[in-house]
Amino acid sequence: MSDERITVVNKWDGPTVKNGLDEVVKKILNDKVGWTEQHNLMNLRLLISFIGVAFSAFACGYDFYAPFPKSKIVLLVCSVSYFICMGVLQLFQWYVEKDCFYEANEVDGKQTRKWAWSSEIKAHDDKYVLSAEFKKEGRSGQGKIIKSIGAYIDNDGEIMIPLVQREVDDLWARLIRSEQ
């Protein structure tokens, strides 16, 4: 993994660059550190979406068997419930997920450290903000790196994995040292 490069990204497209860098960070953490990614946030998002779609499907099915005048109340309740579920989903993404793209548990002897990695690139800005947070038995720590995407992407739009890996290793080591 020392001199690997990943697929070319359009360096002028912020969301594409963010997603590409996030994938590189995931790969580094899974390969080097050996963590297993947890998908709890994604599973909850899928559950909320499924409940909303189930309301919609029930409304369609009920309207098929009992046409409109009879199904008015059911259609109303299901429609309102669907939009409530979508509102809950949006609030979940804003306040619980908070741009988190990677969660993992690190087992260190008898104790388990829960890690959450997130990132962001603001619109019309070249700064990539990589944040890491861990929680372990009442203790926690967090850190972040703010760098221009130009530090990780060459002129051809290729993400340089060794440079990203150095930053991820540095952030991880800083957080481990700060805990002790």
From Swiss-Prot:
Locate the coiled-coil region(s) and give their ranges: none
Share an example GO biological-process annotation for this protein: protein targeting to ER
Entry keyword Lipid metabolism = no
Where it sits in the cell: the answer is: Endoplasmic reticulum membrane
Q: Which InterPro entries match?
A: Spc2/SPCS2
Q: Which residues lie on this side of the membrane: Lumenal?
A: 67-72
Question: Which Pfam families would you find in this protein's record?
Answer: SPC25 (PF06703)
Listed under GO cellular component are: signal peptidase complex
Q: What is its main location?
A: endoplasmic reticulum
Task: Please indicate the ranges of residues that lie on the Cytoplasmic side.
Answer: 1-45, 94-180
Q: Which residues cross the membrane?
A: 46-66, 73-93
Listed A to Z, the keywords are: Endoplasmic reticulum, Membrane, Transmembrane, Transmembrane helix
Q: How does it sit in the membrane?
A: Multi-pass membrane protein
Binding partners and assembly: Component of the signal peptidase complex (SPC) composed of a catalytic subunit sec-11 and three accessory subunits spcs-1, spcs-2 and spcs-3. The complex induces a local thinning of the ER membrane which is used to measure the length of the signal peptide (SP) h-region of protein substrates. This ensures the selectivity of the complex towards h-regions shorter than 18-20 amino acids.
Among PANTHER family, the record links this protein to: MICROSOMAL SIGNAL PEPTIDASE 25 KDA SUBUNIT, SIGNAL PEPTIDASE COMPLEX SUBUNIT 2
Q: Which family does it belong to?
A: Belongs to the SPCS2 family.
The entry's function note states: Component of the signal peptidase complex (SPC) which catalyzes the cleavage of N-terminal signal sequences from nascent proteins as they are translocated into the lumen of the endoplasmic reticulum. Enhances the enzymatic activity of SPC and facilitates the interactions between different components of the translocation site.
Q: What is this protein called?
A: Signal peptidase complex subunit 2
Organism (species): Caenorhabditis briggsae
